[in-house]
Regions:
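A short beta-strand/loop micro-motif in the catalytic core of glycosyltransferases
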Residues: 125, 169-178
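A short, histidine- and acid-enriched strand-loop-helix "catalytic/donor-clamping" loop
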Residues: 131-134, 142-159, 172
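N-terminal strand-loop element at the rim of the active site
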Residues: 24-98
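Short amphipathic alpha-helix
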Residues: 8-19, 33-40
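Carbohydrate-associated surface elements
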Residues: 179, 201
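Histidine-centered beta-alpha loop that forms part of the nucleotide-sugar donor binding/catalytic region
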Residues: 1, 128-129, 149-152, 199-200
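Short N-terminal targeting/anchoring amphipathic segment
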Residues: 102, 112-129
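Short, conserved loop/helix-junction motifs that constitute active-site signature segments
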Residues: 21, 118, 138-142, 164-169, ...
Length: 207
């Protein structure tokens, strides 16, 4: 969703490095157009974002940039209005459970206000749960679609209602550990045969 300096984002960069540039044409779209790791994206990867900030999402200045961007995105394509019933319904559900997660509510809006990409792809991969998964599911035209999960699905606050039951539509679902897989399959038992464990790749030299 961003390219900040966290573990999942670093693992994504390592994965991009592993694809032979002679065999694959790779494009990358970062949903929230921000993160310092953009400077480390392999040169053969085409970055689709028309605008981008390399400010760290953890820095004071970077947080200002990100918050301003999120506020602006609420109104693009009428995303917040289109999702208003969804936001109300899921906010009420969260209140009943005693835990409100604003970020989970906003992912759908951020997905629907993302950049319009008209190209058709052989394969599209959402590397993070939440906004990236929703964006690939709803707005990317591709023959095959895969997605990744890096967090305990239930503990993180995700629900089928928040997802709009999008996961069964993915051909493959990759989780970064057996524990993450177990949590996800508990929520989506029908996806068990299409869910695989794919451990994060690590740059041994960097360590």
């Amino acid at each position: 969703n961003t390219l900040g300096g966290a573990g999942a984002e670093k693992a994504l960069l390592e994965l991009l490095k592993r694809f032979p540039k002679e065999q694959y044409e790779i494009s990358l779209y970062v949903l929230l157009d921000q993160g310092e790791l953009i400077l480390q994206v392999p040169s053969h990867v085409k970055v689709l974002n028309r605008e981008y900030s390399d400010a760290s999402v953890l820095s004071r200045e970077g947080k200002k940039v990100l918050n301003k961007k999120i506020w602006k995105r609420l109104w693009i394509h009428g995303a917040v209005f289109r999702n208003f019933p969804f936001l109300i319904r899921n906010t009420v559900a969260m209140i009943k459970k005693g835990k409100i997660s604003p970020d989970k509510l906003l992912w759908r809006v951020m997905s629907d206000s993302g950049q319009v990409i008209r190209e058709h792809y052989d394969m599209a991969i959402a590397y993070l749960e939440g906004g990236a998964t929703y964006y690939v599911h709803d707005h990317v035209n591709a023959d095959r679609k895969f997605t990744f999960l890096h967090v305990d699905y239930g503990f993180a606050g995700y629900t089928r209602e928040l997802d709009k039951n999008c996961y069964p539509d993915f051909e493959r679902i990759f989780t970064v550990s057996d524990e993450v897989k177990k949590s996800f399959v508990k929520a989506y038992p029908e996806c068990s045969k299409d869910t695989y464990v794919f451990h994060n790749l690590i740059d041994q030299k960097e360590i």
